[in-house]
Amino acid sequence: MIIAIDGPAASGKGTLAKRLAAHYGFRHLDTGVIYRAVAKAMLDAGADLTDEARAAEVARTLDPSRFDDPALKSHAVGEAASVVSAHPQVRAALVEFQKTFAAAPPGAVLDGRDIGTVICPDAEVKIFVVASPEVRAHRRFLEAQSRGEPADEAVILSDIVKRDERDKNRSAAPLKQAPDAVLLDNSYLDIEGGVRAAIDIVEAVRAGRRRV
């Protein structure tokens, strides 16, 4: 079984994906980490983020061991990832990696922006997770504080709104809800409530009550 979870930045999709994977014994891939790794490599090299050819070359030679780098979680890397992920050549370079991961048994949970629409359009379960920009900004603010990083919630909110626009309007795999995805509004659910709601969606499919 493949579970595709999509949604905007800081919507809570990553946490839900990890918990679902643990619950069902499936493998988990946060596809955003892949793009963050490309972005950080570009930043570390002092490269122009708008240089599509350079970014695509980085993507093709990406070292998976970089995926665990705590620095990938920084706000700056996240903003840079939004830029490099808009490059069609970068996305093309990383599509096969994601599809291969999804196809491996016994099952997989992938979260990102285009899992249900591009990477795994035939996924048995598709969930589109949303939350208000204000709630998402506050979550990112708290995350930054927990890491001891300076943060301005108003700036984070502004960046999130801008990132949403970039993600929705990019030419390559724009952020959008798949027609057969279930919408899960995570604005005012705690972690356990969100996980229960997601499990209910998956169980409905497993029981054959609903084709998602």
Curated annotation (Swiss-Prot):
Transmembrane segments: none
Highest taxon of the lineage: Bacteria
Keywords, in A-Z order: ATP-binding, Cytoplasm, Kinase, Nucleotide-binding, Transferase
Positions contributing to ATP binding: 7-15
One GO cellular component term noted in the UniProt record for this chain: cytoplasm
Main location: cytoplasm
GO molecular function: ATP binding; CMP kinase activity; dCMP kinase activity
GO-annotated biological processes: pyrimidine nucleotide metabolic process
Presence of keyword Transferase: yes
Keyword Cytoplasm: yes
Assigned EC number: 2.7.4.25
Subcellular location: Cytoplasm
Reactions mediated catalytically: CMP + ATP = CDP + ADP; dCMP + ATP = dCDP + ADP
UniProt record similarity statement: Belongs to the cytidylate kinase family. Type 1 subfamily.
Name used for this protein in its record: Cytidylate kinase
Organism: Rhodopseudomonas palustris (strain TIE-1)
Gene: cmk
